[in-house]
Every structure is written in C-alpha cells, then in structure tokens.
Design a protein with these regions (language model features):
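Basic nucleic-acid-binding interfaces
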Residues: 98
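Long, contiguous binding/interaction regions
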Residues: 2-5, 9-91, 101-129
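Non-membrane alpha-helical segments in proteins
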Residues: 94-95
Length: 129
C-alpha cells in the first residue's frame, strides 16, 4: 500500500529525503501518565522498537484514530508510514536517547511521539540522514 500525504496525492515517503531526529526521554518512569497509547517499554531498546514500529506501520495511528469522536474526520495524512524507518535507543544516566531516521515529516513524527510519550520527550536536534 502506497502512503500519500494529505494534499499531495501521489507523493509517497520514498519521494522525500530521510531526516535524522535526535530525541530524548528525560524521565522514562513518568511515561505511564502519557495515556492509552504510551510506550509499554521502559528501556532504550524496547522504546526504539516501539517508535520504529509506529513509524513503519499504521497500527498506532489506526488505534488512535478509532478512539476519536469522529474517526472519519481524521486527516488520513497523519497515518503516513515509512517502511524504511529505523530507530536506535541508548541509556544515558536516567534518560533515554533515541535517534530516528525517517522520511516521515517532523509534524507526523511529533504526533506519534505525543501518543507514545505525551509531553515526556524532547527534540534535541535534526539533521539530514
């Protein structure tokens, strides 16, 4: 299934250059308060796997969309996926750093992170991949 961005029919993720996002989870223990879609993992490898799955597949988006009052009104562009996305995680003292490489636009990445981590994450830097 090809992924299209809202307002840009025919533009799939493979047509957009990949970006490297440097992310930080300062207090992984506080993520349980992020809600129904929060990270289940507490460690860097597990969080990296969950975020990678959220970028590669639309399962998290579909669960969130189904929970909305009017699922049909949700912009389908928010469900964009990048099958080539990669995420790696590292523990540094008490915080977890994640590096995501994806073609998904930053606004969609931020939406997925808000679902997984609420306000408990920080975007530290961005660079071309």
């Amino acid at each position: 299934m090809a992924t299209h961005y809202a307002g840009m029919p025919g533009i799939g993720v493979d047509a957009i250059m990949a970006t490297r996002f440097y992310l930080s989870i300062p207090d992984p223990g506080a993520l349980s308060a992020a809600g129904a879609f929060a990270f289940r993992s507490q460690g860097p490898e597990g969080m990296a796997e969950e975020l990678q799955a959220a970028l590669r597949e639309d399962a998290l988006f579909q669960r969130w969309r189904a929970a909305q009052d009017d699922p049909d009104a949700v912009d389908p562009g928010l469900g964009a996926t990048d099958p080539a996305a990669t995420v790696r995680g590292e523990q540094h003292d008490l915080k977890i750093d994640l590096i995501a490489i994806t073609s998904i636009p930053g606004t969609i990445l931020k939406h997925r992170l808000r679902l997984l981590a609420g306000n408990g994450w920080e975007l530290r830097d961005v660079s071309a991949a």
